[in-house]
A protein has these predicted regions:
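Short, acidic/polar
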Residues: 20-33, 73-81, 148-160, 206-210
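Conserved N-terminal beta1-alpha1 strand-loop-helix module at the mouth
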Residues: 1-67, 71-74, 141, 162
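Hydrophobic faces of well-ordered beta-strands that scaffold small-molecule active sites
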Residues: 16-19, 39-41, 67-71, 90-92, ...
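N-terminal amphipathic alpha-helix/helix-capping segment at the start of soluble metabolic enzymes
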Residues: 1-17, 128-137, 192, 247-251
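C-terminal alpha-helical cap/extension of soluble enzyme domains
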Residues: 116-127, 139, 145-152, 184-251
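Alpha-helix-loop-beta-strand connector modules within alpha/beta enzyme cores
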Residues: 50-84, 106-114, 134-137, 182-205, ...
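Glycine/Thr-rich beta-alpha phosphate-binding loop at enzyme active sites
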Residues: 168-185
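Conserved anion-binding
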Residues: 77, 83, 87-161, 165, ...
Length: 251
């Protein structure tokens, strides 16, 4: 199995993904070699094109971090393009119906499980000449719960063959429910999703801030620009006596 994220989850280990939302190969490479298990490539809330993302994934071939793409929607075109350019994870936003997540699994999977067609792409150069035979075993589907409607179908969603992770989108769940984290009704929804997902043997995901929550193993870390800002602030906080002796060297 070349999807190391899936392998780690099968072993009961937590995984963390850094978020990419700008089409810069250098940023992608820095994140891909920073220790993240995967990269959450954000195509729902960014203007990035599949061509730009394909170039980043190719630049990062061989990096430890596995490419996951949050597609704009669970359409055949979006899922097909994402898998053809080498994503091993399809993150499906706003799953409010079982039909939506089933469609994602169908389009991400080759027959007999799905209806993904053969086409040109860089997947073979990235993941091996036997990709057609191994893709279904390695590609993951992550369904996102972002609303009370998603909460209600969490167990049924997790039970769909081909769904690996049910992810609680903390901010959107708050927005759509008009409840705040920490409030009893909000926490009850989170617990319902967690318990329902674990009951059918699937993985529960959430934001990195929830890394200490019981039962969660799949986490989304902040985007690269946020991490860059935090890193710069931490570096400057260490400065006590002016610039380094050699300009640009570590202090």
């Amino acid at each position: 199995m070349y999807n190391t994220v899936k392998q780690k989850l099968l072993e009961g280990k937590p995984v963390i993904g850094g978020t990419i939302q700008t089409p810069d190969p250098q940023i992608y490479l820095a994140m891909a070699h920073s220790g993240f298990d995967f990269l959450w490539i954000e195509m729902q809330h960014s203007p990035m094109t599949y061509q730009e993302v394909a170039l980043m994934i190719w630049a990062g071939r061989g990096a430890p971090a596995i490419p996951f793409i949050r597609v704009p929607d669970a359409t055949e075109g979006d899922v097909q393009k994402a898998t053809d350019i080498g994503a091993l994870g399809i993150i499906v936003p706003m799953v409010n119906t079982i039909a939506k997540v089933k469609a994602a699994v169908k389009y991400a999977s080759y027959p007999p499980r799905g209806s993904r067609s053969l086409g040109g792409g860089q997947y073979g150069a990235l993941w091996g000449s036997d990709y057609r035979q191994t893709a279904n075993e390695n590609i993951m589907v992550v369904g996102m719960v972002e609303s009370p409607e998603g909460v209600e179908i969490a167990e049924e969603m997790a039970a769909v063959e081909g769904v690996d992770v049910v992810f609680v989108a903390s901010s959107d769940l708050s927005s759509f429910s008009e409840l705040k984290q920490g409030e009893a009704k909000y926490e009850a929804m989170v617990s319902k999703v967690r318990d329902a997902t674990l009951a059918v043997g699937r993985t529960v995901g959430g934001p990195f801030a929830w890394k200490e929550r019981e039962g969660f193993h799949f986490f989304q870390a902040p985007p690269a620009e946020v991490l860059a800002r935090r890193g710069a602030m931490a570096l400057l906080a260490e400065v006590t006596d002016g610039i380094a002796e050699t300009e640009g060297s570590e202090r």
